[in-house]
Amino acid sequence: MAPPAVLSKSGVIYGKDVKDLFDYAQEKGFAIPAINVTSSSTVVAALEAARDNKAPIILQTSQGGAAYFAGKGVDNKDQAASIAGSIAAAHYIRAIAPTYGIPVVLHTDHCAKKLLPWFDGMLKADEEFFAKTGTPLFSSHMLDLSEETDDENIATCAKYFERMAKMGQWLEMEIGITGGEEDGVNNEHVEKDALYTSPETVFAVYESLHKISPNFSIAAAFGNVHGVYKPGNVQLRPEILGDHQVYAKKQIGTDAKHPLYLVFHGGSGSTQEEFNTAIKNGVVKVNLDTDCQYAYLTGIRDYVTNKIEYLKAPVGNPEGADKPNKKYFDPRVWVREGEKTMSKRIAEALDIFHTKGQL
């Protein structure tokens, strides 16, 4: 497969370009990290890592992250702050991403049933943006109705996908249960057997959504858990993703190696072998949030620890009682330290997922 034109594009991509990127990822055996962003600082940390490693990147806002982007002082009644924050983040990313010279998928993360007003607000913004520009504001959105019955989950996704498909948007949906807790969806106490989706259930999603558009991916559960846990506490079985592909191929009657676009949730703390197996079985996107949050902290933590004597007062430090400390407490200095350590962690992920050097 020849490298698609999307690899040479700069800025936010959508529609056929997103599909071409995911097709190429499956063909070449790599996955794209999806980084949760909550501020302009975390956005540029992710973009910098992708640019420096010649890789595409997915930037996504969660419902809570979007509310934070809007400002914690904004009332989130009826998801107003989350809607405003997501839209603000989208416009910011659209404005700054071309500067970094890489293709960027602009995505939104888990949206549970109780958060659908947030989704509705974003989709309204997409349709308004599309009417003016011919492109949706966001490349893609995710619906996570895994707490509902499979029938309701699939039917609701199909209803929204009908609207999204008119704009060429990509839909990610979750079927089965990812353990742990993630912005509005809490599955910390489910039985372990419930953390594995069956091939029949995954194919039911395909049957419903493929009639509308091929632009969708499935986050099927294979033991995933959000957050980071001690080794042995999480039993991932990424090999069952191959079972989903085989079953779908048989049902469709296709020779395509990977008829399904799959997503790996709860990627923080997983092993290289687990990632390799998942990617081999058609995973094109890996969510990475908790690891990035901690990485961002470490840069700031270490800076404050090492410069503590320069941060106790505006004036006065070990070099003299009259020495100013502005160059040490300026937010641009210590926030930058968090950006650097977050970028480093994303660079590691780009290497692990074989995304590095794909542009």
Curated annotation (Swiss-Prot):
Pathway: Carbohydrate degradation; glycolysis; D-glyceraldehyde 3-phosphate and glycerone phosphate from D-glucose: step 4/4. Its cofactor is Zn(2+). Its EC number is 4.1.2.13. Zn(2+) 2 binds at residues 144, 174. D-glyceraldehyde 3-phosphate binds at residue 62. One of its GO terms (cellular component) is cell surface. The keyword Nucleotide-binding does not apply. GO terms for molecular function: fructose-bisphosphate aldolase activity; zinc ion binding. The active site is at residue 109. Zn(2+) 1 binds at residues 110, 226, 265. GO terms for biological process: biological process involved in interaction with host; cellular response to xenobiotic stimulus; gluconeogenesis; glycolytic process; symbiont-mediated perturbation of host immune response. The keyword Hydrolase does not apply. Belongs to the class II fructose-bisphosphate aldolase family. Catalyzes the aldol condensation of dihydroxyacetone phosphate (DHAP or glycerone-phosphate) with glyceraldehyde 3-phosphate (G3P) to form fructose 1,6-bisphosphate (FBP) in gluconeogenesis and the reverse reaction in glycolysis. PANTHER family: FRUCTOSE-BISPHOSPHATE ALDOLASE, FRUCTOSE-BISPHOSPHATE ALDOLASE CLASS 2. This is Fructose-bisphosphate aldolase. It comes from Candida albicans (strain SC5314 / ATCC MYA-2876).
